[in-house]
Amino acid sequence: MVGILLRVLAIVVVLFALAVIAGPFLISSEPREGLASNTEAAMAESRFVRIPFAGTAGLAVHYLEPPTDAPSWATPFLLLHGFTFNAWTWQPALDAFAARGRVVAYDQVPYGLSAKPARADWDGPNPFSKEAAITQLFAVMDALDLERAVLVGNSSGGTLALEAALARPGRVEALILVAPWVYVTRPTLPATVASLPQMRRLSLLIARKLGENGPLLDLSYADASAITDGRRERFAIHARVAGWDLAWGELLSLSLSTPVTVSEHLVQVQVPVLVVTGEMDRVVPVDDSRRVAGQLPDASFVVIPGCGHVPQEECPDQFARVVGDWLDARRIGASGR
């Protein structure tokens, strides 16, 4: 009897191992069909610029830029969205920034309507790496004639803003970090493991779930019932563009082996910083944002009551007041009053 049980157990173990090894190969790696180009999916307010990137023929970057009556000398603002979001996360706040200077919100590659390069599209650095995101940020600034700017980053966009300020402080006037994703507790895998075919297929599956179902949008609001149909439409606009799922899968696969280490360098940030968070943030704990502000040499910290992870969307009036008061106190840009 014991021998039979051991044989059955051995068979179960073997079947489980085969499922783990072979199961991910059941996930299709073919891109979603019947989708449009980024320009075909564009909205009336959409703009595009092509930036150089090593090993490619250039990358198309989608951005939003409202008109401004601010004086030409006013410092411009460059707005950086978070993971799975896009430039439209800043739409409710664009006019408030435009009252103080030129403002540009762009889709980081491969989000929104920006380029979604497939592996065959590049022969050089990975366009989805942290280093690539920094390079692309400054390439956008160059292409749009932004010599120096205030970087405004939400969530992982705040991480990118910090990395950019550390890399090229001479081009950053100040930072506004909205619930920055700095103290990350997620595990990372060795590159050899993350690059296994099975892991790449699983990354693709997760990317599709995140991109098609949009769970992070609801999680980012204190009150998800406030999310309009129009907001959901723009959040998911990437899913209209051919190759979006493969590009997101590539980014997610790479992130599995890329630790977030910017917290180790906060004391080196040389510019003034405003850290803002929502009182009811369920993505980045309020204490994490407070801790970021405490580690920076020159930072202010504000909590906006009743808001979640994206106060610029959910509480735009309060957000604009907090940011405006800080900019006025620091005498950065033109006054919005």
Question: What feature does the model see in each segment?
Answer:
Residues 166, 174-205:
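Flexible "cap/lid" loop of the alpha/beta hydrolase fold
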Residues 66-116:
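Conserved HGGG/HGGXW glycine-rich cap/lid loop of the alpha/beta-hydrolase fold
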Residues 1-75, 100-101, 128, 146-147, ...:
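Alpha/beta-hydrolase fold catalytic core
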Residues 52-57, 64-70, 108-152, 321:
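Active-site loop/oxyanion-hole signature of alpha/beta-hydrolase fold enzymes
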Residues 298-337:
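Catalytic active-site module of serine/aspartate enzymes centered on a nucleophile-bearing elbow/loop
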Residues 27-28, 187-191, 206-265:
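Conserved alpha/beta-hydrolase catalytic His-Asp/Glu region
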Residues 269, 275-277, 281:
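Short beta-strand/loop motif that positions the catalytic acidic residue
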Residues 153, 157, 161:
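Gly/Ala-rich beta-loop-alpha elbow adjacent to hydrolase catalytic centers
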